[in-house]
Amino acid sequence: MKELNRRTFLTLSGAAVVALSLAGCGGGPSAPPAPAAPTQKELDLLKALNRALEDHWNELGRPGTLRTLSYSQDASDFARHFVSPCVKADKAEVEMTPEQDAAFENEMLERLQALRKKYGSDMSLREGVIGCEYVLGHPHPHEMKLTIPYALSGENFKNTFIEMHNWMDMETRDLGIYCPTVAGTDYMVIVPLSDRRVH
C-alpha cells in the first residue's frame, strides 16, 4: 500500500480504510454473483405470450381487460432453480434418490415461502411450474421431467399459453421465464407471479 501521511489517513472513513488495506494486500471481498439476465429466447417468449394475450382479449371483445405481463427476476430464478436437476444432469427426465429429492424439496419450499412472504400471499406463487412434471409437497416418484420444447407458435406454444392463462388471476402482472437447453433441445419453463402486497 502506498504511504499516506497521518492526517490524510485519519480522515478516511472506516470503509475506505478497509478497502485500501485490501487493495494493498491484493485481495478483497468477493461480490455476490449478479442474477442471470434474461436471454433473447426468454425475451422473445415473453413478447409472444403478451401478443397471444392481446389476441385472446381482442377475440373476446374485451380489449380493456388487457394487461402486459413483465419479466420477473424473482420468478425466473425460482424457475431456474426448480428445474436445475434436469439442467445439471443434461437430461430432460431425471430420477433422484429419496435423499436428493428430500434435500431438493426442502430447498425449493424455502424459496417458495420466501417469495410468498415477499409478494404478500400463499396465492402469489404455486408449488409447481409450467413446463415441468414435478410438484412440491405432493407424493410422487422421485422423478422430474421437462415437458415443453421451446416454441413461439404452433401447438406447443398454444397449449402453453392456455395453461399459463388458466394459472393467472387478477393480480398476475409478472412472469418468470427460463429457457434452458438440455440434451440439445431448448425447453421453456414459465412461472406466473401474482403480487398481492398492499400498495
What is each model feature region?
Residues 1-20:
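N-terminal secretory signal peptides and thylakoid transit peptides that target proteins
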Residues 3-4, 37-40, 198-199:
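Short N-terminal secondary-structure initiator segments
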Residues 30-35, 193-197:
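Protruding loop/beta-arch "assembly-hinge" segments enriched in small, turn-prone residues
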Residues 33-115:
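Short, well-ordered surface patches within globular domains
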Residues 102-199:
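A well-ordered secondary-structure block
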